[in-house]
Amino acid sequence: MFQSKAQVRLVEHLLQNRQKVFNQAGLARVLDVSPSTVARIAEPLVKSKILLFERYEKGMKIFAFNQEEPAARSLVEFYEKISGL
């Protein structure tokens, strides 16, 4: 399902912070990758609707975990199960 370690770290960060909204630069800092890497690893998650994406003023890219998507809810359930181990 996930294409790289960076993408796994992105999903884990989003699962840990499900209620928050992030910009691309902030995610890049947290994940210690370039903003272009964030864009690349986020694209399949946006296409699968796990991640919501909007472009705001002057091109700022905003991301949020899509808690309404069934696949995203399944990820939350799985994450909560393995976190409890």
Protein language model annotation of sequence segments:
Residues 42-43:
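Short, hydrophobic-biased segments on the C-terminal half of alpha helices
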Residues 15-19:
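Short helix-capping/hinge SLiMs at alpha-helix to coil transitions
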Residues 1-7, 23, 52-78:
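Short, cationic-aromatic polyanion-contact patches
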Residues 35-36:
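Key DNA-contact positions within bacterial/archaeal DNA-binding proteins
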Residues 49:
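Glycine-centered, phosphate/nucleic-acid-interacting loop/turn motifs that mediate DNA/RNA or nucleotide
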Residues 26-28:
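A short acidic, leucine-rich amphipathic alpha-helix
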